[in-house]
Curated annotation (Swiss-Prot):
It comes from Rhizobium meliloti (strain 1021). ATP binds at G366, P367, S368, A369, S370, G371, K372, S373. Keywords: ATP-binding, Cell inner membrane, Cell membrane, Membrane, Nucleotide-binding, Plasmid, Transmembrane, Transmembrane helix, Transport. Belongs to the ABC transporter superfamily. CDD domains: ABCC_Protease_Secretion. It comes from the Bacteria. This is Type I secretion system ATP-binding protein PrsD. InterPro entries: AAA+_ATPase, ABC1_TM_dom, ABC1_TM_sf, ABC_transporter-like_ATP-bd, ABC_transporter-like_CS, ATPase_T1SS_PrtD-like, P-loop_NTPase, Type_1_exporter.
Amino acid sequence: MATSKGRNADPAAALRDCRAAFIGVGVASALVNLLYLTGSFFMLEVYDRILPSRSIPSLIALSLLALLLYAFQGAFELIRGRMLVRIAGALDESLNGRIYRAIVKAPLKLRMQGDGLQALRDFDQVRSFLSGVGPAALFDLPWLPFYIAICFLFHPVIGLIAIIGGLILTLLTYLTNRGTQAPAKKASEAGGLRNVFAQASQRNAEVVHAMGMSARLTALWERRNTEFRDENRRTSDIGNGYGALSKVFRMALQSGVLAAGAVLVIRGEASPGIIIAGSILTARALAPVELAIGNWRGLVAARQSWQRLKELLNALPEADAPLQLPDPHERLTVEGLASGPPAAQRLVVSDVNFTVRAGGAVGVIGPSASGKSSLARAILGIWPAYRGSVRLDGAALDQWDSDALGKHVGYLPQDVELFAGTIAQNICRFAEDATSEAIVAAAKAARVNDLILRLPNGYDTEIGDGGMTLSAGQRQRVALARALYGDPFLVVLDEPNSNLDAEGEQALSEAIMSVRSRGGIVIVVAHRPSALASVDLVLMMNEGRMQAFGPKEQVLGQVLRPQQVERQNALKVVAEGQEAKQ
């Protein structure tokens, strides 16, 4: 089965690629529904021909033929079910990579709600529905008129009863859809918020325990869980109510067909076989409707999930990879940069202009909330540039393929996050072609090789989700090695010494100097003065704007001189006050 794999895979194309498989399911459904007539005609022949003739050989032959047809019916049912499972697998093969990339990209491009994993749950919902009995019922529904037509061939009265039953069950299907759609959507939204709250509580377990927040958070959890449970129960109650009503109605309708057939036989207007055959056929005609009602909740959930997936993927289109550019090796240029959070349209950084050549290192300083970390995100393209540009060797970031650019960029975020896996896997960024030499070289560049070797399994030590088995300082130094892996041209470090001791700070300074010595560029967001030891340039940020940029001694002199004057004036005021008291 062909699939539209790759960067440009989209839901519509994935479904088109499955067109032949859906046609195959339709053909299998046609054969299954034709073979469903076996039971009705078997009973008709038994009552109208076999019993009057009292022929045992004819009964045996007819029974063998029925068994053969039932075997074919079962085989086609099996084929149809397996084809639906493989359609679900083909959609997964086609879209799973695109959906994963969208999940990762969405926080950088869109204003997200919930835990950001709704798309993954939506895709699981669609795949689960396609692999179940719901689609088979939908493929059987178009055969309802065919069965009703056969009922008319038996007798117009039986056909009329089947039509009335079909219309009533169709009405129940419509009411089921209308009644469950809104609560199902609310239940999905409430479930997402509940999951986000649970994950946040788990991440902050130490804070919850230390500050005695468990009781209050439990009460809040119970309110959110109650909202989810109530909407879920409402959806189930509506679906189960209409499902039970349709089942009772179908059983009553089947008894009505038996009664009508008996009346027709008594009046001599039909043969005795019509009583049983008509009942079986009517039940079969209406069974897909009842099955559809029973699986309507899954259908509604799958339809809503599919719609959300399409909206997400349409909001995050994937362009073809641009032309491969030469490796950057000359300069970083920031021109009139204005940036802010994704989809917020709110500028946090404005009017930033500077150029750094190979071998240079910039320390970004400024008071809290001055835009230092925001500038780092904008330089890396994590936050969009609403005005201006960031260029490497003259090429704007959007002219690079993100994967290709990533090889030339190292990033140590302020909040370090490692992945579940080994230390070696985290350092090499999970590259399958990574060599031991490159991994060890990155660790040595970050001066963390000896620390790693002291761990139980060295580079093969499993660190758990988020690096939970490591201390904060160890995580930061492993993340620094990850940023230095592959000798990237641009290395951005956001408060890299926040969790480091004196030894770690010395290792950081040496790592910055090693990047500069090989011709790389380092951007260091500094909160402690010690982080500026190995930089030659300083950029001063204040209220989201660049206040100064230039050689370290010059900029620090401009910054520190007013502070020294202010301190001296303060001391003078204190001294004068003491003299006045004396």
